[in-house]
């Protein structure tokens, strides 16, 4: 091999050697850069975890300003302009969405699922009442009407579609206290597979401005999400009284709750499989706007029981009791005093307690006589508007 060729190969070898050293140096720089970036990523994740660490503040997303800031409402009733963490999915930020806020900066650090802020009791299959229609003595007309209003549209919706009519959306149960309104609703909840949501009207009256209407929206949103469902609002007269020129902020807030309730009732799709049951002792105080057809299509009255109803209620309650042969239920039924179904239940319970007090295993007629006198005297007279 000639000296010139050997010299050329040596020069090329040296060049390749320098390039290799240069690549090794660059590789070292890249490795250090990767380590630095990993360290920064680890620090950033630790910082993000620290920002997201509990306790956080729950708030309500109202509206976005731009991609990085938004307006949120706090549980204290104030609104704030806050930053949105870059890791938060913007697609989940819808109006009235519940969000988690940083406890110091109030920045939005996450979106909470709807169930997190749900103070609304939802009864599952295992939590539904065990009351059946057979446990409710009498009330045959009321049972039939509530079945047609609530059960049939949920179980046989095709029947209404073939006839060409819209099923009733809501029903109002009204009558004196203790006439079986709530107990019949429990039987409805037991006999249907629908989700049962029960709230009391007074629960919508909250301390802070806007909380009551928001809770109404949450109730009906939850009902639509879990359809088929039944919404039962007990003591609805606490939020649905006739509107007037309110002079206090509390009265105005109650009227806002009523307006939101009217809006939600109007927003129902007949095919949504959501039924509303409301109960009250004072139907005469309910706002007429709520009573019109299209909102509460059926009004079912629960009067004080007549002689036949008393007999059926007594028989339903005493069927599970150990009675002496001397017990004459008919003598209690024929008495002229106006008593409710709850009074009849109290009479039977009191008679049973008298037997327990005397260490007896059977209830006698004398126990019923003493219990009747005690309960009727305690119940007194009914207010004028129930007569």
Swiss-Prot record:
Its main location: cytoplasm. Keywords: ATP-binding, Cytoplasm, Nucleotide-binding, Nucleus, Proteasome. It comes from the Eukaryota. GO terms for molecular function: ATP binding; ATP hydrolysis activity. It is found in: Cytoplasm; Nucleus. Gene3D superfamilies: 1.10.8.60, Nucleic acid-binding proteins, P-loop containing nucleotide triphosphate hydrolases. One of its GO terms (cellular component) is nucleus. Signal peptide: none annotated. It holds the Pfam family AAA. Acts as a regulatory subunit of the 26S proteasome which degrades poly-ubiquitinated proteins in the cytoplasm and in the nucleus. It is essential for the regulated turnover of proteins and for the removal of misfolded proteins. The proteasome is a multicatalytic proteinase complex that is characterized by its ability to cleave peptides with Arg, Phe, Tyr, Leu, and Glu adjacent to the leaving group at neutral or slightly basic pH. Belongs to the AAA ATPase family. This is 26S proteasome regulatory subunit 6B homolog. It comes from Encephalitozoon cuniculi (strain GB-M1) (Microsporidian parasite). The lineage of its organism: Eukaryota, Fungi, Fungi incertae sedis, Microsporidia, Unikaryonidae.
